[in-house]
Structures are given as C-alpha cells and as structure tokens.
Amino acid sequence: MTIERTFSIVKPDAVKRNLIGAIYRRIEKTGMQIVAAKMLRLTKEQAEGFYAEHEGKEFFDELVAYMMSGPVMVQVLEGENAVVRYRELMGKTNPEEAACGSLRADYAISMRYNSVHGADSPESAAREIAYFFAEDEICPRPAE
C-alpha cells in the first residue's frame, strides 16, 4: 500500500457556485483524506508562478486572470495512490470528454472553467504542495 500526497485546487468557478463541500465529500468518499486546506485569493505573482510551465502559451494570460478572478481552495490530499486516484476522480480537462460521474463531468462549465486542478505526477504534487504549504501546515490523520 503506497500512501502518497497530491495537490488539489477548487477553482474560482466552483467556489463561486458553492461547490467546495460537494467536491470535498466526493474526495472523502474515495477514502482520501484532506490533510491541509486554505482559501486564498491568488495574486498575479502567485498565479504566474504556479503556472510558470505554461508561460508563453496562448492561454497563459487568460489562465492567470481566471485564477485571480475569485477565491480558490487549495488542499493537500493523502491516500493510497492519491495522484492517480484524484486525477481519475477529476476526469479529463475537457468536461465533454470527462467520464460520467467525475468532478469535471458533473461540475465544470467548460474547458476553461473546469472547476478543479490536480497534480499530474508525484513530483508535481510535491512541488505544488510546497508552493502553498509549509510542512507544519499539513496534518496527517490516522487511517480508520
């Protein structure tokens, strides 16, 4: 059993539509635990830094503006194979292609307003977690 951490964002469109609780319930139903969470309003510098790998791409400025458009929830999830399991729960980036029952199929408005972000690898998860959380802000919980 490989317990790992992953990083997740509930994006501005989902926060605005009061979907935080619904998304958290879906995460917890998978057996993953939320071990750190906070609400933020990203600055331009934070959004640009977080999405630096996309700098220079045609959608970069729009993505940064969207992520600054309202509060976001950032959280650390922990569980067995958390990166893969959370990506499966999220569904494909394009909600029209996302599996029925996935977060994006159920909650996303469009490819741009797709409600959630999740790390795509354990390495990305570690980098993204460290971008928003100090180690002492993460509170592992014993498994039941």
Swiss-Prot record:
Its main location: cytoplasm. Its EC number is 2.7.4.6. Pfam families: NDK. It is found in: Cytoplasm. ATP binds at K11, F59, R87, T93, R104, N114. Keywords: ATP-binding, Cytoplasm, Kinase, Magnesium, Metal-binding, Nucleotide metabolism, Nucleotide-binding, Phosphoprotein, Transferase. PROSITE patterns: NDPK_LIKE. One of its GO terms (molecular function) is ATP binding. The active site is at H117 (pros-phosphohistidine intermediate). GO terms for cellular component: cytoplasm. GO terms for biological process: CTP biosynthetic process; GTP biosynthetic process; UTP biosynthetic process. Signal peptide: none annotated. It catalyses: a 2'-deoxyribonucleoside 5'-diphosphate + ATP = a 2'-deoxyribonucleoside 5'-triphosphate + ADP; a ribonucleoside 5'-diphosphate + ATP = a ribonucleoside 5'-triphosphate + ADP. CDD domains: NDPk_I. It is an enzyme of class 2 (transferase). Its cofactor is Mg(2+). SMART domains: NDK. NCBIfam families: PRK00668.1. Belongs to the NDK family. Major role in the synthesis of nucleoside triphosphates other than ATP. The ATP gamma phosphate is transferred to the NDP beta phosphate via a ping-pong mechanism, using a phosphorylated active-site intermediate. Homotetramer. This is Nucleoside diphosphate kinase. The lineage of its organism: Bacteria, Pseudomonadati, Pseudomonadota, Gammaproteobacteria, Vibrionales.
